[in-house]
Amino acid sequence: MELKNIIFDLDGTLLSSNQIPLEQTVEFLKDLQKKGIRITFASGRSHILIRNTATFITPNLPVISSNGALVYDFASEKPVHIKPIDNKVIPAIMQMLLEFQETFYFYTDKKVFAFTHELDSAKILSTRSQIVGIDLIENNYIVNKFEKALDFDFKQHTITKILLVTKNREKVPFLAKQLDQIQDINYVSSMTFALDIMQKDVNKAYGLKVLVDNYNLDPEKTMVFGDADNDVEIFQSVKWPVALVNGTDLAKKNAKFITEYDNNHNGIYFFLKKFLAT
């Protein structure tokens, strides 16, 4: 068996609907690590918000966060690569965000800033994890009233990703068309009600290349698990792309394998157990 590395998306893949990995899967992955297989994560989440998962499974490699815009090493507690959104294009994005009055999040190299019309702080806290898969991390997650966005000095921050969230899923294609008018950005739908905005050419495969170039990761000896449209490029970059059965049609179309069970029923565990037995 030439499998040496496994990379996991988090939301909808390694994590159950309760936002934690299932125990049976965790124990199996720890056994694989003991056998020399390296494990890490590739997520749309900020590295700040990946940390909770790393308490269940310690990654052997830096994690690919913000859809590839920031690769972070938990061992050294330092970023090893950052590709931020160019400050020149942020005003155009800001204009769109303010015009359409949708909740949005600035992911930076140090914090996450949320801007929302939800004035009930308790409601904001409860929906952070349920809606956008965000862990409640004190001091690193700043919730602001929507109007505060006018005062946000983006030039003082290294912005790796902007997450746009709408309550109306049917509005996503319309919002995507507005983003098409802005040059030098890339966007993808990581959830049916959200759009992730990054610098042009940034995606999870971009983050993967950082590991290939700096950490002796061979794509021909690598498996990737994912479930969403933002996994397509990294699926196309490795030998064994695996989509969860609960994944999007586009993710499954670009996968070599599809799990029998979903993320709430140890889909990863059952797939790997069968795959490694052959």
UniProtKB/Swiss-Prot annotation:
Cofactors demanded by this protein: Mg(2+)
UniProt signal peptide: none
InterPro entries named among the record's database cross-references: Cof, HAD-like_sf, HAD-SF_hydro_IIB, HAD_sf
Cited Gene3D superfamilies: 3.30.1240.10, HAD superfamily/HAD-like
GO MF, one annotated term: magnesium ion binding
Location of the active site: 9 (nucleophile)
Keyword hit for Magnesium: yes
Enzyme class, UniProt record, top EC level: hydrolase
Annotated GO CC locations: cytosol
Binding site for Mg(2+): 9, 11, 227
Key words, A-Z: Hydrolase, Magnesium, Metal-binding
Its EC number(s): 3.1.3.-
Entry binding sites for phosphate: 10, 43-44, 204, 230
Family stated for the protein in its record: Belongs to the HAD-like hydrolase superfamily. Cof family.
Identification of the protein by name: Putative phosphatase MG265
Protein species of origin: Mycoplasma genitalium (strain ATCC 33530 / DSM 19775 / NCTC 10195 / G37) (Mycoplasmoides genitalium)
